[in-house]
Swiss-Prot record:
Keywords: Cell inner membrane, Cell membrane, Membrane, Transmembrane, Transmembrane helix. This is Inner membrane-spanning protein YciB. Pfam families: IspA. The gene is yciB. It is found in: Cell inner membrane. It comes from Agrobacterium fabrum (strain C58 / ATCC 33970). InterPro entries: YciB. Plays a role in cell envelope biogenesis, maintenance of cell envelope integrity and membrane homeostasis. Belongs to the YciB family.
Length: 204
């Protein structure tokens, strides 16, 4: 039987690689002296990038083993991590890993808003099994998330271009996740208002 991932484990699998990235960047010199093999990656940000790729692959593998499927968003994000992480290490240029959130969020935003342009509320295809909304509800929720992803893309560009690498790493871990959680919670009243009533409720 395929197991369902508990919300806590799902949160750990999503946040774990980011925590590894933050720790490896902040303690890069200690890691390099303790595990000399890591110096093959380069400086702290490159060590963090290498371990981030490994942690991401591990999280995706655990998710697959437990559920025999991979959620589309973590999968796409993981692919971009591997591509841009590899470029970062190969060229020894941290610009690529810094642009990864911009690319991922822009991709999600364009896909969602592009779907609306063609009359498709793509968010509904992803979450329809979790909760049911009216067509109008899916359209508006898709629009909100599409705009939010583009906002995150712009915000990432501002932070990595205007601040230090350490500040960007801290923001990536301690800024982006809380902002996303707050935004998600803020959508709950909207989701409740546009939820489809269970069939048969009005027939009693």
């Amino acid at each position: 039987m395929v197991a369902e991932i508990s919300p806590l484990l799902k949160f750990v699998l999503e946040l774990g690689p980011l925590m590894v990235f933050f720790f490896a960047n902040s303690r890069g010199e200690w890691l390099a002296s303790t595990f000399p093999v890591l110096t093959e990656f380069g400086g702290p940000i490159f060590i963090a990038t290498g371990l981030f790729m490994i942690a991401t692959a591990t999280a995706l593998t655990v998710s697959w083993i437990l559920t025999r499927k991979l959620p589309i968003m973590p999968l796409i994000s993981g692919i971009v991590v591997f591509v841009f992480g590899a470029l970062t290490l190969w060229l020894q240029n941290d610009t690529f890993i810094k642009m990864k959130p911009t690319i991922v969020n822009t991709l999600f935003g364009v896909i969602l808003l592009g779907g609306l342009f063609f009359g498709q509320s793509l968010l509904g295809y992803v979450f329809n099994s979790a909760f049911k909304l009216t067509d109008e509800g899916w359209r508006k929720l898709t629009l909100r998330w599409g705009v939010f992803f583009l906002f995150l893309a712009v915000l990432n560009e501002v932070v990595w271009r205007m601040f230090t690498t350490d500040t960007w790493v801290a923001f990536k871990v301690w800024g982006t996740m809380p902002i996303t959680i707050i935004f998600t919670m803020a959508q709950m009243p909207f989701v409740m208002r546009h939820s489809v009533e269970p069939l048969g409720k009005d027939e009693k």
